[in-house]
Amino acid sequence: MLPNLSEIEARLIGCLMEKSVTTPDQMPLTLNALTNAANQKSARDPVMALTQSEVQRAMRALAQRRLVQIDENFKTGVAKYRQRLCGATSFVDIQLDCAQFAIVTLLLLRGAQTPGELRARAGRLYTFADNNEVATAASALIDDDTPETSIVVRLPRAKGRKEAQFMHQLAGEVDRSVPVGAEAGHHEA
């Protein structure tokens, strides 16, 4: 069963996944480092301005659901965090290869994206040969028989776009009938 993450929880898990690949020597992350990662102005959509209290509260909730591990150093009083959503220490039945890990990370950090956008943004996480490799890796995370349990869904192609977008369902089931950006009054810049 997929977790139903809040927007903040999805961002924090995405940050922990990203930093485990891009800065593995800094893992696990301190509260300050995780807050800074969540509030980055680049490579995030939407940009957030979370306080350390909000991050700490969300991390406690994630730890209760065993989606993160909190390593507490009682001598220094510093807690450090690592994700357990996927990988060897996962408590959720999510096993991802490197390409899929990159895709899920980017979807958690930036929301719905096309294969071209995922490929362009994945450089530090994984190098995709082409957009077809992205689409193949993302499609492997889709379960057509039970779409409500798919980690990823393919959204209909939005008007004016060449490609359909992919979106994660770790924050709840996504309405696959409406392309992202097609909601009333929403216009992309």
Please describe what each predicted stretch is.
Residues 1-15, 21, 25, 59-95:
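Intrinsically disordered, low-complexity serine/threonine- and proline-rich regulatory segments
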Residues 23-47, 112-128:
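Short acidic, hydrophobic short linear motifs in intrinsically disordered regions
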Residues 56-74, 139-158:
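A short, conserved structural fragment
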Residues 15, 58, 137, 169:
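Residues in the recognition helix of alpha-helical DNA-binding motifs
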Residues 6-28, 94-112, 138-143:
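Positively charged, polyanion-binding regions of nucleic-acid-associated proteins
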Residues 103, 116-155:
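A contiguous pocket-lining binding segment that forms or flanks enzyme active sites
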